[in-house]
Amino acid sequence: METRALWLMLLVVLVAGSSGIAADYVGLSPSQCMVPANVRVDCGYPSVTSEQCNNRGCCFDSSIPNVPWCFKPLQETECTF
C-alpha cells in the first residue's frame, strides 16, 4: 500500500510540474517566434489561449494589439555552401 501511495504522489508531482511547460513554445526555438507584427500569419482563432496556440505548433504574443496573437513561426533554414 505504501508503494502505491508513493507512485501516486510521484504521478501527481509530474503532472503538476508539466502544466507549466505548456506555456513554452512546443518544439520551437525562440528565434522562430521573432516574427515582425506586419508579416504574421494567423494560426489561431478568436480567444485562443497561449497554451492552445503553442499546442498547435504556433507562436503566441499578445503584447501588440490589432495583429494576430497566435501566428505561424518562421521556418528555420539550413545554410548550404
Curated annotation (Swiss-Prot):
SUPFAM superfamilies: Trefoil. It is found in: Secreted, Extracellular space, Extracellular matrix; Cytoplasm. Residues 1-22 form the signal peptide. It comes from the Eukaryota. Disulfide bonds join C33-C59, C43-C58, C53-C70. Its main location: secreted. Monomer. Homodimer; disulfide-linked. Involved in the maintenance and repair of the intestinal mucosa. Promotes the mobility of epithelial cells in healing processes (motogen). This is Trefoil factor 3. The gene is Tff3.
